[in-house]
């Protein structure tokens, strides 16, 4: 499925992106695997770990529509894992949470449509099912944007889907242990 394809992972330096990169490289031979993240230190650390010639690192933020558009040129698949997911930070910085989780989702969708990306898979959370905080509410809105994008493209090239999952042990999520 991913052999010979170009794949972009937004939030690629996060817990999911890091593990997914490991899995992709072990199972497939992608033409390009682009890690899109605003964290240059984590990108540097990933460069030290993953030496596959297909790896590319793109400093960028999903809130920047022009940068997002450029990063998706020639991409076949997008895994959208970028999010502001720390619940207390989202509550204290609501505008930044909305800009990242909702506006960022819209930027991913528009860039994918404009670049004829074959498939976009957006990661979501169980907190979007019955939101009780801003993080859950923004992820619910994001989910709806991705699903509705299929109506916008109609029979067009791009397809969009959302995968919701719960808290993952060992991730840098918002669950406090102890």
Which residue stretches match the model-derived regions?
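Adenine-nucleotide cofactor-binding loop residues
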Residues: 41, 63, 85
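N-terminal Rossmann NAD(P)H-binding glycine-rich loop of SDR-like oxidoreductase domains
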Residues: 5-27
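Conserved residues in the N-terminal Rossmann fold of short-chain dehydrogenase/reductase
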Residues: 37, 58-59, 99
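Conserved glycine-rich Rossmann-like NAD(P)H-binding loop of the short-chain dehydrogenase/reductase
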Residues: 25-42
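Short, conserved SAM-binding/catalytic segment
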Residues: 46-55
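Conserved Rossmann-fold cofactor-binding substructure of NAD(P)-dependent oxidoreductases
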Residues: 56-77
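Conserved Rossmann-fold NAD(P)-dependent oxidoreductase catalytic core, especially the SDR/UDP-sugar
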Residues: 77-80, 84-153, 158-166
């Amino acid at each position: 499925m991913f052999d010979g394809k170009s794949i972009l992972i937004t939030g690629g330096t996060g817990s999911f992106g890091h593990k997914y990169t490991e899995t992709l490289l072990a199972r497939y031979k992608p033409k390009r695997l682009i890690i899109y993240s605003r964290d240059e230190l984590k990108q540097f650390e990933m460069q030290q770990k993953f030496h596959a010639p297909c790896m590319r690192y793109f400093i960028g933020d999903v809130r920047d529509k022009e940068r997002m558009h450029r990063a998706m040129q020639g991409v076949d698949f997008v895994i959208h894992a970028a999010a502001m997911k720390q619940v207390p930070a989202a509550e204290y910085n609501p505008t930044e949470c909305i800009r990242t989780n909702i506006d960022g989702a819209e930027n991913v969708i528009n860039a994918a449509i404009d670049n004829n990306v074959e498939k976009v898979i957006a990661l979501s959370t169980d907190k979007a099912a019955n939101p009780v905080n801003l993080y859950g509410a923004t992820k619910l809105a994001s989910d709806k944007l991705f699903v509705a994008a299929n109506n916008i493209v109609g029979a067009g090239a791009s397809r969009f889907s959302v995968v919701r999952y719960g808290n993952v042990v060992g991730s840098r999520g918002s669950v406090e242990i102890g």
